[in-house]
C-alpha cells in the first residue's frame, strides 16, 4: 500500500513545538469525508431498512478511530480510553438533541448534520480547554478532539436510527431512550472508537492494522443493532462484516508480529 507522509506538530524536549513526519496509508481528510457521507446518508435512508444506518456506522467508527490514533500517539496510551469516552460523553448529548429536532420540520439528514456540527463544536471547546487551560502539550488536540466528538455523535446517530427504524424523535424516544438501549449504544460506540489504537499501540503499530480493527469494532456495532432489534438481516450482515474485518486484522497482525507461537495453557500458580 502506498504510504503518504502527514506533517503534524510535536513538542520537543524543551517544550517548543516542532514538525514530525507520520506515515499514513489513508489521509485523515479522506477518512473524515467517507465517514460524514456514509453516516449522513445512512441516517437519511434509515426508513428504507435499518441495515443501511447499521452498516453506515462502520466508516464513521473508522474515522473516529483514526482521530484517536493521531492524538493518542503523543503519549504512552494511558489516555486512550478516557478520550474515547469523552468523545461519546459530548456526542450523546448532541445525538439526542439531533433526534429531538428530527421530525416533520427537520428531515433526518439535516438533523444528522446539525447533531454532528454540535458535536464538533463541543469537541473543539474540549480541545481548547485541554490544551489552553489544562496545558496538555498536544498540538493536534483541538482538531482531533473535534473529530472524535463529531464522529462519536454521528456513530451514535446511525445506531439510534438503526434500532429505531427511522431517525425521528418519536421512534428514537420509544425504541432507544425509553427502553434504556441508549446506554448500550453509547458504550459500544465509545469502546469502538478507543479500542483499535489501544489494542494496537506500540512500536510496530500501523494505521492500516489499527483501522482494520476499527472496521471490526464498527461491525460489532452492526451486530449489536441486529441483536437489539432482533432483526436477522442486520444481525447476519453484521456477523459477515465482522468475520471479514477480523480475518483481515488477524492477517495484518501476523504480518507485523515478530513471530506467532502457541505457548500452551498457562500453568496454575501455587
UniProtKB/Swiss-Prot annotation:
The pathway that the record names for this protein is: One-carbon metabolism; methanogenesis from CO(2); methyl-coenzyme M from 5,10-methylene-5,6,7,8-tetrahydromethanopterin: step 2/2
Q: Which biological process annotations from GO are given for this protein?
A: methanogenesis, from carbon dioxide; methylation; one-carbon metabolic process
One Pfam family for this entry, by name? MtrC
Indicate the transmembrane segments per the record. Answer: 22-42, 45-65, 83-103, 109-129, 148-168, 177-197, 224-244
Q: What is this protein called?
A: Tetrahydromethanopterin S-methyltransferase subunit C
User: Native species of this protein?
Assistant: Methanopyrus kandleri (strain AV19 / DSM 6324 / JCM 9639 / NBRC 100938)
What domain of life does the UniProt record list for this protein's source? Archaea
Quote the cellular component terms of the Gene Ontology held in the record.
plasma membrane
GO molecular function terms attached to this record: tetrahydromethanopterin S-methyltransferase activity
Q: Which gene encodes it?
A: mtrC
Amino acid at each position: 500500500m502506498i504510504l503518504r507522509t502527514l506533517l503534524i506538530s510535536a513538542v520537543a524536549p524543551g517544550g517548543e513545538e516542532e514538525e514530525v513526519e507520520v506515515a499514513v496509508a489513508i489521509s485523515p481528510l479522506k477518512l473524515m469525508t467517507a465517514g460524514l457521507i456514509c453516516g449522513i446518508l445512512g441516517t437519511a435512508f434509515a426508513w428504507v431498512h435499518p441495515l443501511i444506518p447499521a452498516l453506515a456506522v462502520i466508516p464513521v467508527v473508522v474515522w473516529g478511530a483514526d482521530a484517536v490514533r493521531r492524538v493518542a500517539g503523543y503519549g504512552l496510551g494511558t489516555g486512550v480510553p478516557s478520550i474515547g469516552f469523552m468523545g461519546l460523553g459530548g456526542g450523546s448529548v448532541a445525538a439526542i438533541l439531533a433526534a429531538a429536532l428530527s421530525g416533520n420540520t427537520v428531515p433526518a439528514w439535516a438533523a444528522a448534520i446539525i447533531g454532528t456540527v454540535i458535536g464538533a463544536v463541543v469537541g473543539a471547546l474540549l480541545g481548547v480547554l485541554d490544551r489552553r487551560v489544562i496545558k496538555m502539550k498536544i498540538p493536534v488536540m483541538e482538531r482531533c478532539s473535534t473529530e472524535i466528538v463529531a464522529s462519536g455523535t454521528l456513530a451514535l446517530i446511525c445506531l439510534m436510527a438503526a434500532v429505531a427504524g427511522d431517525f425521528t424523535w418519536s421512534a428514537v424516544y420509544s425504541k432507544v431512550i425509553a427502553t434504556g438501549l441508549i446506554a448500550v449504544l453509547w458504550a459500544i460506540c465509545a469502546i469502538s472508537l478507543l479500542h483499535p489504537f489501544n489494542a494496537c499501540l506500540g512500536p510496530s503499530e500501523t494505521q492500516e492494522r489499527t483501522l482494520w480493527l476499527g472496521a471490526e469494532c464498527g461491525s460489532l456495532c452492526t451486530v449489536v443493532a441486529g441483536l437489539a432489534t432482533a432483526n436477522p438481516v442486520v444481525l447476519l450482515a453484521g456477523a459477515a462484516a465482522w468475520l471479514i474485518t477480523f480475518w483481515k486484522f488477524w492477517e495484518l497482525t501476523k504480518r507485523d508480529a515478530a513471530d506467532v507461537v502457541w505457548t500452551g495453557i498457562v500453568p496454575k500458580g501455587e
